[in-house]
């Protein structure tokens, strides 16, 4: 899994620990944030990293939006994870191009504390649009991207891999 902030200055204001996230139920009200998560679908690390943040964001009065063009969320998983099912909104069966536009519009509204979108590779212009929309709506936007298998012929990619065997 590789995470990459698309808005570096946000993290330049000091360390933001998990304790701070747990104490602050107004996450996303100070600044918007766009971050890209590249992950391996066979390893649960992304869910384990994102779930505490999503649980905290679920305490806000705003919605949590999932833009999933290819798949449908499992209601059973949502309930088991403790996420507020009544605050979840999912848009599926939309084209990847429309997903970028939908994510931008959703972030701008301020109606969502977080928008998770499974998007294709983005241009710098698209990233900038999403960052501005997140700032305007004071929301988190997570660009979710399953990891493509990296072939040795393409060289070494600088990524952090968290293996599921490290978790009990």
Curated annotation (Swiss-Prot):
Component of the SOS system and an inhibitor of cell division. Accumulation of SulA causes rapid cessation of cell division and the appearance of long, non-septate filaments. In the presence of GTP, binds a polymerization-competent form of FtsZ in a 1:1 ratio, thus inhibiting FtsZ polymerization and therefore preventing it from participating in the assembly of the Z ring. This mechanism prevents the premature segregation of damaged DNA to daughter cells during cell division. NCBIfam families: PRK10595.1 (NF007892), SOS_SulA_coli (TIGR00623). Is rapidly cleaved and degraded by the Lon protease once DNA damage is repaired. Belongs to the SulA family. This is Cell division inhibitor SulA. Residues 161-168 are annotated as: Lon protease binding. Induction: By DNA damage, as part of the SOS response. Keywords: Cell cycle, Cell division, DNA damage, Septation, SOS response. Interacts with FtsZ. PANTHER family: BLR3025 PROTEIN-RELATED, CELL DIVISION INHIBITOR SULA. One of its GO terms (biological process) is division septum assembly. The record marks 168 as: Essential for degradation by Lon protease. It comes from the Bacteria. Residues 106-112 are annotated as: FtsZ binding. The lineage of its organism: Bacteria, Pseudomonadati, Pseudomonadota, Gammaproteobacteria, Enterobacterales. Gene3D superfamilies: P-loop containing nucleotide triphosphate hydrolases (3.40.50.300). Coiled coil: none annotated.
């Amino acid at each position: 899994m590789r995470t990459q902030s698309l808005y570096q200055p946000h993290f330049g204001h000091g360390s933001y620990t998990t304790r701070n996230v747990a104490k602050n139920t107004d996450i996303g009200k100070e600044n918007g944030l766009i971050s890209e998560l590249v992950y391996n679908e066979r390893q649960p690390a992304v869910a384990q990293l994102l779930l505490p943040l999503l649980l905290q964001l679920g305490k806000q009065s705003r919605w949590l939006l999932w833009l999933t063009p290819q798949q449908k969320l499992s209601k059973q998983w949502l309930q088991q994870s403790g996420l507020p099912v009544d605050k979840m909104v999912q848009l599926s069966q939309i084209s990847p191009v429309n997903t970028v536009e939908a994510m931008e519009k959703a972030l701008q509204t301020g109606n969502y504390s977080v928008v998770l979108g499974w998007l294709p590779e983005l241009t710098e212009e698209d990233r900038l649009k999403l960052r501005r929309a997140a700032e305007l709506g004071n929301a988190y936007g997570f660009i979710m991207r399953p990891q493509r298998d990296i072939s040795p012929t393409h060289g070494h990619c600088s990524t952090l891999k968290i293996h599921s065997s490290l978790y009990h």
